[in-house]
């Protein structure tokens, strides 16, 4: 087998392989000889089939198998001999010649691929980050305890107007400039007035309503609302009040805590505090990652494989266009032209690919492994996110190995981030909840905001829960 490098430019490689016809003939004869005792043909005793007849019957199919084996083995062995790692599966181009299957012509094919870039991992000691730790107000814990206990309260219908603390059942349709927007409608929504469950201004306008009332309210979505096509927008909601219920007197004591499954009020407060700390801890973790990745992004500027870049860009671009379509918006609405957006998202794709390679290299150097138990836990975590569809989701992962493999990357990344956190300078800083949440919605592990606004996501008038890290 003759191996010749025909292209070596940047990360691109092309290798030409020539397997002489005589070598193919030798392999075919060996294959025929090894199988002659195993093949049974009518009219011939086992092992007595003439070689010429056997070749006529099976020669081309055996040769096709041999050619496939040569190509498969060559892809692995050539890369190993050259000490290269292919960024993607090499593209194989075969020169067509019918004589090859008869062993009368050389088998010529080429491998085209991009290598993963080689770069040195730099020291991490110079990286400095701020770890913001939210100081949780006791009032927030008090309010959450009340919400938990109110969920166990009994409610009874009332005839009079609603008051703060009452539970109203409503149908609503949200509109922007008179046009209903996606995700802005719900039937039989239950809302406890004063719970701050919905966006500011929504609940307050339902104080004083009675069952059977129809009302249109006006609200303004917060400027930092996560569905950005609604952020800062004025909207109207057509509301039909279906029921108003008054709760029993809310008691905040050990007996009330026991109704929600905890032994005491003190224990309930501990659980609530832990949940809130975990919630804000996820935000802290996300902002830490952003700082680390920004620092790594500044440290590395190597060439990346075009194939990986195109895949990442196409994934981002498809998601962007899908989000815009769902939101009924255009690039012009976002303050950019499509050409500008392409350029900005390509920069984002470059950042993601480069950071992915850096994190992967760090992980390989320190021996990061993802265990099967960790993958199983990740699968179950995904399943829990779809209540009522557990069987379907589990079947999906069971029948789609690549989906399980995709869960490996974030686990791997978390372990690398933990490794870096132990080696960089981290300064803890106590902040208010408001300070922690400032610009939190703009935080993304591997991106800098490419557009003035992000594209849309599923809309709800309810407040958004914090992101998971």
From Swiss-Prot:
Q: Which UniProt keywords apply?
A: Cell cycle, Cell division, Chaperone, Cytoplasm, Isomerase, Rotamase
Reported EC number(s) for this entry are 5.2.1.8
Q: Which residues form the PPIase FKBP-type domain?
A: 165-250
**What is the first-listed, main subcellular location in coarse terms?**
cytoplasm
Segments of this protein annotated with the region Disordered? 444-469
Which GO CC annotations does the UniProt entry carry? cytoplasm
Is this entry keyworded Cell inner membrane? no
Role description: Involved in protein export. Acts as a chaperone by maintaining the newly synthesized protein in an open conformation. Functions as a peptidyl-prolyl cis-trans isomerase.
Q: What is known of its domains?
A: Consists of 3 domains; the N-terminus binds the ribosome, the middle domain has PPIase activity, while the C-terminus has intrinsic chaperone activity on its own.
- Write down what this protein is called: Trigger factor
* NCBIfam families, alphabetized: tig (TIGR00115)
Which residue stretches does the UniProt record annotate as biased composition, category Basic and acidic residues?
A: 444-460
Entry similarity comment: Belongs to the FKBP-type PPIase family. Tig subfamily.
Q: Where in the cell is it found?
A: Cytoplasm
Please write the reaction equations for the catalytic activity of this protein.
[protein]-peptidylproline (omega=180) = [protein]-peptidylproline (omega=0)
Q: What class of enzyme is it?
A: isomerase
Record's Gene3D superfamilies? 3.10.50.40, Trigger factor ribosome-binding domain, Trigger factor, C-terminal domain
PROSITE patterns given for it? FKBP_PPIASE
Biological processes, Gene Ontology terms:
'de novo' cotranslational protein folding; cell division; chaperone-mediated protein folding; protein transport; protein unfolding
Q: Under the GO molecular function aspect, what terms does this record hold?
A: peptidyl-prolyl cis-trans isomerase activity; protein folding chaperone; ribosome binding
């Amino acid at each position: 087998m003759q191996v010749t490098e025909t292209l070596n430019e940047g990360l691109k490689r092309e290798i030409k392989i020539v397997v002489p016809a005589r070598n193919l003939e030798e392999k075919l004869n060996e294959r025929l000889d090894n199988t002659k005792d195993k093949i049974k043909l009518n009219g011939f005793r086992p092992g007595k089939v003439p070689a010429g007849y056997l070749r006529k019957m099976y020669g081309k199919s055996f040769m096709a198998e041999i050619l496939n084996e040569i190509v498969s083995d060559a892809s692995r062995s050539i890369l190993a001999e050259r000490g290269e790692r292919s960024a993607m599966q090499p593209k194989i181009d075969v020169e067509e010649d019918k004589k090859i299957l008869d062993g009368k012509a050389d088998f010529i094919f080429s491998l085209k691929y991009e290598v993963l870039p080689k770069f040195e991992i730099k020291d991490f000691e110079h990286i400095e980050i701020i770890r913001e730790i939210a100081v949780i107000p006791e009032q927030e814990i008090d309010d959450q305890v009340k919400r938990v206990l109110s969920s166990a309260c009994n409610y009874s219908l009332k005839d009079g107007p609603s008051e703060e603390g009452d539970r109203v059942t409503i149908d609503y349709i949200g509109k922007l400039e008179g046009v209903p927007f996606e995700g802005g409608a719900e039937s039989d929504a239950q809302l406890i007035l004063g719970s701050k469950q919905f966006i500011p201004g929504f609940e307050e306008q339902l104080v004083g309503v009675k069952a059977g009332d129809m009302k249109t309210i006006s609200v303004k979505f917060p400027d930092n609302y996560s569905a950005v096509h609604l952020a800062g927008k004025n909207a109207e909601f057509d509301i039909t009040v279906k029921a108003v219920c008054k709760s029993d007197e809310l008691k905040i004591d050990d007996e009330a805590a026991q109704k929600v499954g905890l032994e005491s009020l003190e224990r309930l407060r501990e659980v609530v505090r832990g949940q809130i700390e975990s919630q804000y801890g996820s935000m802290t973790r996300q902002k830490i990652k952003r700082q680390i990745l920004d620092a790594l992004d500044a440290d590395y500027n190597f060439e990346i494989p075009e194939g990986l870049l195109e895949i990442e860009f196409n994934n981002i671009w498809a998601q962007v266009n899908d989000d815009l379509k769902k939101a009924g918006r255009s690039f012009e609405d976002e303050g950019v032209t499509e050409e500008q957006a392409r350029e900005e998202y390509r920069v984002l794709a470059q950042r993601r690919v480069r950071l992915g390679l850096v994190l992967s290299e760090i992980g390989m150097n320190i021996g990061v492994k993802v265990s099967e138990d960790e993958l199983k836990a990740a699968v179950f975590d995904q399943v829990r996110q779809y209540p009522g569809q557990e069987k379907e989701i589990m079947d999906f992962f069971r029948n789609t190995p690549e989906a399980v493999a995709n869960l490996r990357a974030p686990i791997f990344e978390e372990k690398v981030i933990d490794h870096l956190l132990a080696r960089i300078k981290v300064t803890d800083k106590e902040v208010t909840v408001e300070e922690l949440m400032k610009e939190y919605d703009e935080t993304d592990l591997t991106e800098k905001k490419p557009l003035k606004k992000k594209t849309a996501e599923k809309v709800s008038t309810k407040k958004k829960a914090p992101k998971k890290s």
